[in-house]
């Protein structure tokens, strides 16, 4: 079985990549030390920079194809190509679940205004929706308007309430 696939009972989990930028690990983990990172050389590109994986997860279960997060999109990003390479038809995605509404989680919803997952329902956390669609927040980041708002406008979004 390929390394990017794990089966748990009847559920198939497929690891998907969008990008593997090389940058300082302190961007995401500011309270760590270089000594701590050096204990994991497989995560380090060189003595100062680490691999910072952007990815998603596809889940096949009970006849459904679920995508957890849609990556970043942009320069160097390749989620749609990785899906194709791993045999996942983006038009077959039934449900997209967002863990949260950050650019590396909602970036491939649309390309040039066209949906990349045209047959999917999108599950969006209520708290994130409420926060990012407030008038004072909506234009503070460039991805909400082109990648998240059209989900509601096109009637393909369901809000999820509570903790998960």
List each model region and its residues.
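Nucleotide phosphate-binding site architecture
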Residues: 14, 104, 130
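Intrinsically disordered, low-complexity boundary segments flanking structured domains
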Residues: 1-5, 110-111, 142-148
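Catalytic metal-binding/acid-base residues of hydrolase active sites
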Residues: 71-73, 102, 128
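Active-site metal-binding motif and surrounding structural segment of the metallo-beta-lactamase
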Residues: 76-123
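Flexible, glycine-rich phosphate/dinucleotide-binding loops
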Residues: 22, 112, 131
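Metallo-beta-lactamase
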Residues: 88, 121-164
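Short, well-ordered secondary-structure micro-motifs
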Residues: 26, 109, 133-136
């Amino acid at each position: 079985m390929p390394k990017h696939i794990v089966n748990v009972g009847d559920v198939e989990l497929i690891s998907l990549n969008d990008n593997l930028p090389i940058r300082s690990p302190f961007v995401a983990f500011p309270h760590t030390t270089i000594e701590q990172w050096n204990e994991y050389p497989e995560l380090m590109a060189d003595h100062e920079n680490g691999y910072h994986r952007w990815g998603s997860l596809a889940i096949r279960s009970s006849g459904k194809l679920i995508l957890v997060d849609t990556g970043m999109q942009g320069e160097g990003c390749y989620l749609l190509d990785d899906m194709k390479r791993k045999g996942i038809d983006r038009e077959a995605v039934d449900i997209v679940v967002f863990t949260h509404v950050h650019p590396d989680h909602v970036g491939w919803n649309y390309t040039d205004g066209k949906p990349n997952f045209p047959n999917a329902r999108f599950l969006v956390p209520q708290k994130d929706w409420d926060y990012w669609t407030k008038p004072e927040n909506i234009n503070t980041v460039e991805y909400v308007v082109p990648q998240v708002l059209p989900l509601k406008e096109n009637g393909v979004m369901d809000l999820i309430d509570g903790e998960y």
